[in-house]
Amino acid sequence: MRTVCLKLFMVFSLFFPAFWSTFNEDYKMEYYAVFTAAYAALLLYMIFQVWKGKRKKEQRFTLVYLAILILYNGLSLYMNLNYLHWYGEQINNTVAFLFFLVLMAYEDSLGEKEEECIRFFLGCAVLSNVLSIVYYFLGYTAFLICNNHFYFVRLPEDYYEFRHYWIYSHKSDYALMLIGFMAVCIRFRDRFKHRASWFLSMGVFLVALFLSHSWTGFGAAALIFAGAVLDRIDWKKFRFQKIYLLWAGLLAVAGGIAGKLILAERDLLSLGGRREIWSGALKAIRETPTGWGYLFGEALFDATPTWSVNNAHNVFLNAMLRFSVPVGLCFIGMILLIAVYSLVRSRSFLAVGMWIGFFLLLNMDYCLLNYEIGMFLFVIYLVCIYRPKGKEEVWNGMVETKGN
């Protein structure tokens, strides 16, 4: 039953992203998601896991993690009761973070059929993005299911660039998830029956990433591919050869071409005005340390004397801007704790590249909303922490037979 619940979570997350929101207005409803169908499936999974599953021995990480999660909920409840009066973020984030805790704390975390669960996820991720590409060429940008209504979104005809969101709130959210999906495919490349199917799957993700028009996403993708290459090297036997200079030159040429394409659209030195936006956001946070609450999405702060924006274009700054400094710091602490622990557990360059890519995206845009965190954490678990039970696996040059 646990595997079935996880499959339901995948189907809802990747095909039918139904959620309920305080608002129906475009651009605000995603910011104020109260609950999701995917998280209902996660609640069922956690109930069955706690009821039927076998707990691992106590781990220091899970105790520290649980302590920060309890602190996060205590501070969120206080701020909601006294200032913000909106509980959707606290509810959704708690479900997502508890899900990661249960994955960490119990044996057989993927349920009764672990291998089937992984293959099902890989298949769903690829198929979802095949549908995404078809959806784009039909002329649509985003697909949402909110408050029992279907939204088929198109960009304005005179929009300044092409971009694609698929079932996510913004192109940067989509890019973040695509980076995660590619990392999972690299991590479990041996689960594909044929090498051609793996290359085709990666091609689907790269085409989808191109359609998203997230140049930061392509930088993050380069990092995970670099990490994957470094993981394939047997460093004990490594010897420098002149042919490597040729490969380095080809990479430099490819990087130069990519840089020229990006510079034709973006001023990289200005970071798209991010420094001014972040400075303005910090000033707004200092002025309202208890958080904006329902004002977020409507209220503006000054990035420059002649330019105002409605969000910090940064996941961590927005957490403080929206939900107060104490709650935001707890949220940041949770993400950093997960990052450090998963990197220590993975001992792989793939994980390092993935996390650097994640942090690039998380710091450049508001690319992780509460109803997306569950899938984000699931991807991190699969890439960095999960180990096939009783199965030998080559992992960063070492053979492991540990369970998950």
Pin down the residues of each PLM region.
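N-terminal signal-anchor transmembrane segment
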Residues: M1-W51, L71-M79, F358-L360
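Membrane-interfacial loop-to-transmembrane alpha-helix junctions, especially the N-terminal start
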Residues: R2-M10, K54-I68, E114-F121, A196-W198, ...
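Hydrophobic transmembrane alpha-helices and their immediate junctions
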Residues: G53, R60, D190-S197, A222-I233, ...
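Transmembrane alpha-helices of multi-pass inner-membrane enzymes
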Residues: A183, V352-N363, L368-N404
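Long extracytoplasmic/lumenal interhelical loops at the membrane interface
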Residues: A264-F323, F331
